[in-house]
Amino acid sequence: MTRITFPMIVLAVMITTGCTQQKAEQSQERLNLSNLDRTVAPGASFYQYATGGWQEANPIPDEYARYGSFDVLREENQVQIQSLITELGTQVNPVGSNAQKVGGLYALGMDSVKLNRDGAAPIRPQLEEIAGAKDKKDIVLLMAKVSRYASSPFFGFTVGADDKNSGMNIAHIYQSGIGMGDRDYYLLEDAHSRMLRDAYVALMETQFQHTGYTGAGAKQAAANVMKIETELARAHVTKEMRRLPELNYHKMWVSDLNAKVAPFEWALYFEAMGAADLDSLNVSQIEPVKAAVAIIRREPVAVLQDYLSWKVINSAAGYLSDDFVNANFEFYGKALSGSKELRPRWRRTIDAVNGAMGEAVGQLYVEKYFPAQAKERMLDLVDNLKTALGERISQLEWMDDETKSKAQEKLGTFIVKIGYPDKWKDYSSLEIREDSYWQNMMRASEFEYGEMIAELGKPVDKTKWYMSPQTVNAYYSPSSNEICFPAGILQPPFFYMNGDDAINYGGIGVVIGHEMTHGFD
């Protein structure tokens, strides 16, 4: 389950405890004793006692680094979505409809012949644009442009609620720009970290060569990127520090950025980001942004071009030919995550379509799979658990009356979202063309960026969802004090529409309680 903190920190905690057909649900809506290991005394190892049978019956598949009931449901959910999208392919869908766009994007992702024939051609226009940069001004403009459709270079830019005025959206810039995800992988000297660094450099060399670099050129480009990312990582704050809101809030006037952060072409950058009239923002982590600016000012244009090119190549790799995909998996799947086998193309493509057009897929999904009555059943469960939590708060001996009053107030004002949004996102301005899988993923990213930048300076939309309805997960958002349970998780083994209350409290009830307690982290 997920605690969503905006704009850029997402803390995910997935619960591994472990509706499409009533018959299937009825066969599961009771305690399955075969999941237990009754050869072990509960007092000796309750975990083994409670899950030993399930573990023995469900060995970790080669394509996973971890595996639990959550993952089983996610796989089943993907089968549902595949069935839905395959059905779209048998219909004549109006041009420009969500059904046509979803089906068209999925077809491009599944067309291995075209993907392998195209090779690196789909990213050639972006790489040529970067290669044409003549000076640092061009680099700043490209940095902004790339961040609209690829992994943020140098530092990130987003729009989200003001932590100290949660009803208003403001701009935030924050640490970003590293390809291995965590600073420790760049800095620690243990054998595993050194292995990852070597593997990451090897990945970059391979992918640069796939785009046409010579062997020597690819080696130099990879070294340039690694130098920049290591310097960025050295300035990045730790995961632990990012969890402390007071250390990640530095709101200031744009006119003060040169003095309080670093001299930079801020006006040019914000204009390129579509925020020319920006007057204030939050700099979540000052030192990493300062370090990024220092790199841009110091390094030659050619070195910065290699870095920006890598951001494009690495972001696009999963949507290109098999040589890109396989090299990407060797590092991100095997070395970094521990997976042994690449997931089937159809599963990867469904994930991509969900990411690109989440609510479009979600609208089709709930029409086919989610009964409206489930909302009412869930509301009853949530209300009962809120009451129970309120009673526990009132009985806490270690909490003073003033704090109890504040806690009860927060509990009483939880916004509860169940199943799917009341208003669906409008995808009419998003074009899905037949040119390439990657170019459509670019358009989808740029569409989402446009949706985000349109919220700048406006009140927070309390009706907005931060997960698509088909997602097998849930979240709590502190900025809006809301808990959300998408339709995707409201299926066995978490939720049974016609099941006994005891089964539902032991399944989705755990998830509800988990998200509620995030409100009191």
Stretch-by-stretch model annotation:
Residues 45-49, 170-172, 482-486, 519:
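Structural recognition of the beta-strand scaffold that forms the well-ordered cores
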Residues 41-44, 49-114:
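Active-site-surrounding "flap" and adjacent substrate/cofactor-binding loops of secreted or lumenal enzymes
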Residues 20-29:
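Bacterial Sec signal peptide processing site at the extreme N-terminus
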Residues 1-8:
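Bacterial N-terminal signal peptides that target proteins for export
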Residues 15-18:
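C-terminal motif of bacterial Sec signal peptides marking the signal peptidase cleavage site
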Residues 88-379, 384:
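Noncatalytic, helix-rich "gating/capping" subdomain that lines the substrate-entry/channel surface
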